[in-house]
Amino acid sequence: SVLESEFLSFDGRRGTSRSDPSIHRNPGREKELNIAYRFRIYPTEEQKILLGKTFGCCRFLYNQMLNDKIQEYKKTKKMLKNTPAMYKKAYPFLKEVDSLALANVQLHLEKAYKNFFRDPKVGFPRFKSKHHSKNSYTTNVVNGNILVEGNRIRLPKLKWISMKKHREPAENCRLKSVT
């Protein structure tokens, strides 16, 4: 069986050439297309441990932030604006994992709330279970912290991980995030 943590997907953006007439309708703005690539990764034992910690910290932070939002709303009838930085002092183990992964947890929770308020049929955000949740996290490219060279990818805190690169991304593709 294949673990969910052994898959990696890229979200890249690809611009179009100047000969495309749709670009001239918006002068100075290139047309962008989001493309996702999915590659299998082969982490070392040490990297598997850090991936497991990251999955756990993301799940823990999501649940903690959701619980705090619920409790604050019950007390004050106002929405709490909490960030991952607020939790790092109380829970020092959160400093061991990628900070952008924790920042994306906050964004995912905010999106869940927006979806709920936009359409209540979507349902209130739910707590994440250790046994029934998908082991994944998302990190963003900031100042070249994620690189792809040959059959390897460098991720924050994990360093270089070998991967099965079964196809080449488009030439003018920019890496935006990794999940």
Model-derived regions: residue spans:
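Nucleic-acid substrate recognition interfaces
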Residues: 1-179
